[in-house]
Amino acid sequence: MDDKNNQEENELSKISEVELIKKITKSFKNTNKSTIIDIGDDAALLKFDKTNVTISQDILVEGVHFDLSYMPLKHLGYKSVIVNISDIISMNVKPSHILVSIAVSNRFKINALEELYEGINLACKNYNIDLIGGDTTS
């Protein structure tokens, strides 16, 4: 019986995202005075001299957050920006820059990725955001 309870307690599907974050980061302690709001909120708040910087990151996973059988890549690109800037906005901050990191399989053609980036570009234009870098792997 104890083994079954231990197995159930160890199942990701049994806890919320917030509970998971608390469990896996409980031994981390901030060492920098610049960290004002850390893990556990929608975004991090850092203070450098008199300047506040808010940082957020979200990941979208196919089959979990979107389904390409009915979501056009342009819409996915737009959504990928919105889900990230919404965390910044929820902290009452105007987003200004984004990094895009993408892991894409070789099943996609270059023009498909161009369509994805059309959506990213449209969201950036609509919200006056600069794309300043990121990481791409395939």
Task: Describe each region flagged by the PLM.
Residues 1-72, 91, 100, 118-119, ...:
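Extreme N-terminal cap/leader segments of soluble proteins
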